[in-house]
Amino acid sequence: RQKTPVEWAMVQNNLGNTLVTLGIQLNDKARINQAADAFRAALEVRTRDTFPVSWATSRLNLGNALSGVARFDMGTGTLEEAAAAYDDALTVFTRQRFSMDWASAQNNLGSIYQTLGQRTRDASRLEQSVAAFQAARQVYVRRKFPLDWAMSYYNLGNTLQLLGGVTDKPEHYGEAVDAYRNALREYQRETNPRQWALTQAGLGSTLHWLSMSNADPKTLRDSIAARRAALEVLTIETAPVDWANAQNGIGMSLLNLGNIERTGKYLDEAEAAFTATLKVFTRESQPMQWAFEQNNLGDIHWNRASYGGGKPEYLKAIAFFENAKQGFTEAGYTIPIPLTDQKIDLVKQQLAKK
């Protein structure tokens, strides 16, 4: 560093890029942390006053590394540091002079604000995410950069879906549906199968939540169709968690569809979907998600009992709700337990009247 500081800083920056790539590939937090340290070292030489473009490049790279570290941490400190790094980079990388770097920083900033908003349930952060993704699309025009254009719409859809949940405003779900459908204009199953499937899954999830406000059976059927489309690509072997989440979503939509139409004809399909998730969401590996699936299966049997299933269905419902309660306790997630207790009491009261 003393003899050739500029070259030393360049090597540190390049080392950081290599470590980020390796750390993400190996899901290795330690390597990504080392990358962040390498970028910080480079920034000791690459100051804004002396080397503004190199400084902005290393700040952008540091933001990328910190966003990778943040995947392993459930707090907000690392995310805030990453956002500050991207904001710094944007003071040099203007749209007029460095359009691609500017768009990349805007897109990455949108992802950071999305995660911050999700973790804090802060609508203002999610609105910042929306603004950043929309800004990126000023450069990522469909004609020149079709896949980047589609990516920005997919990311926007994810943020708008979260914003709908945080604000309880269904219009955001409608906006998210439009965003996902725009992404699907470029994401084709034949050419971009994984992104196509993830977008279908996002669309299915958003349509499910939209149906909660409009009680429209067609919206639920569209949700189920989108998630089933996603499962054509997202298999249990290649994407187990995505596969299980899609199965869970199908089960929830089928259950709700039966409630809207006042019929039990969808219960068998819903039960099969919830049961399928247990191949991935085991009690040992993911106790909280396992508990939610136990709760969902309890709802299936409770519904079946109300459609004439009799005493055995009530008893199965109680057993599944008890399992769910135990799973939530083991996971240290106590919020759903009072509601689960209420369900158990109600089922027992109904059973006593039989």
Task: Describe each PLM feature range.
Residues 6-24, 53-68, 100-118, 147-162, ...:
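Conserved alpha-helical positions within TPR/SEL1-like repeat arrays
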Residues 15, 21-26, 48, 62, ...:
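Glycine-centered coil turns and helix-coil junctions that link the paired helices
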Residues 1-8, 43-55, 90-102, 137-149, ...:
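Flexible helix-coil transition and linker loops at the boundaries of alpha-helical arrays
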